[in-house]
Amino acid sequence: MLCMNRPCFLVIDREFPGSVSTRKLVIETAKFNVLTAYSGKEALDIFTRFPAVSGIVLDGGLDDVSSSDVAREVKRLQPKMPIIVIATPGFTGCPVADYQLESFDPAKLLEILRSLKPEASAAIEKRNEDLSREKY
């Protein structure tokens, strides 16, 4: 039995709790683990409890705390933590983010996430291929 540590990303989405985050679904489909926060405050609480996440996917249009403030606090706590900000209408930018996507592009988001953890991504892909071959 293959033991695999899958990357885990913190997704900060402004959709309300109880709804299903599209970003979360896209990332989980790629076989990554996801923690989800629905506000900047909740995100910082989760990040404090689970600081070993592989990266952060941040909605640029949070309501309670600006995405720039969330990103600055994360970088204060862990300067090397990768942060991907997804722009929303009216978004003015986030200077401390490592990546900024102009809109939600699932393929581009996954490309960035896979580049953050290439070895784990390759292992996941190989495992998926092996499982596909076993089926047939």
Task: Please report, for each region that a protein language model flagged, where it lies by residue.
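A generic structural motif
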Residues: 30-34
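Conserved phosphotransfer microenvironments
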Residues: 55-78
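Structural motif corresponding to alpha-helix initiation and N-cap regions
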Residues: 40, 64-68, 106
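A structural signal for short coil/turn segments at secondary-structure junctions
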Residues: 4, 29, 50-51, 78
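Non-catalytic signal-transmission and effector/linker regions of two-component phosphorelay proteins
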Residues: 1-25, 90-92, 104-136
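Alpha4 helix (beta4-alpha4-beta5 surface) of REC/receiver domains from two-component response regulators
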Residues: 69, 73-76, 82-111, 121
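Short beta-strand/turn micro-motifs composed of small residues
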Residues: 11-13, 58, 85-87
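Acidic, metal-coordinating helix/loop segments flanking the phosphotransfer/catalytic sites
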Residues: 38-55
